[in-house]
C-alpha cells in the first residue's frame, strides 16, 4: 500500500544520505563538495555572529532561542514572527545573499531553527504577500515554518552536514528536483538550527 511504499522510500533515502555523508567524511571529493564546504563555513559564520551579538547585548539568549511562533494576521501561506526575527533580518542577509552566486544551480540558502522556522530568507523570496496564495508560496517564503521531511531534517541534523534530495514546490504547480545540503548552527554549545542551501540536480 501507499504507507508501506512511503516508509520504504523514506528508509532508502535515509540510507543513501548516510552513504553520502560517510563518503564525504573520508575526504573523497564529489560534485557536492563545494556546496557542503560552503554551508559548513556559513553555519560557522552565523554561529560566530550570534555569539558576538549575545556578548554585545544586541539580543538575549532567551530571545534568540524563542520558539513561540506568533501568526502574522492575514497571511496565506501562514507566516510567523518570533522574538529573534527582526534580529536575523538585520544580520543574516550579509551571510546568505553572497552564497547565491556560488554556482548557477544554487536556488536558495537560509538559516532555520530546530523546528524548521525560516525567519529571514533570500531577498528574492521575501516579497510582501499579496492576495494570491499560489504567488505567495513561491515569492514570500520568509517567516515560514517548513516542517516537511527535508526541512525538519536540515533543522534537526547534528552531524557535520546532511545532504538530501527532494522535489521542491516552486509554486504555480511546478516542481524541481533539488539537493538540500545543510550544516548545524550552534550557539554557545546549544543547537540553534541549521543552515540550508538548495541547488538544482545537474542534468
Where are these regions (language model features)?
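N-terminal membrane-sensor/transducer module of prokaryotic signaling receptors
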Residues: 4-203
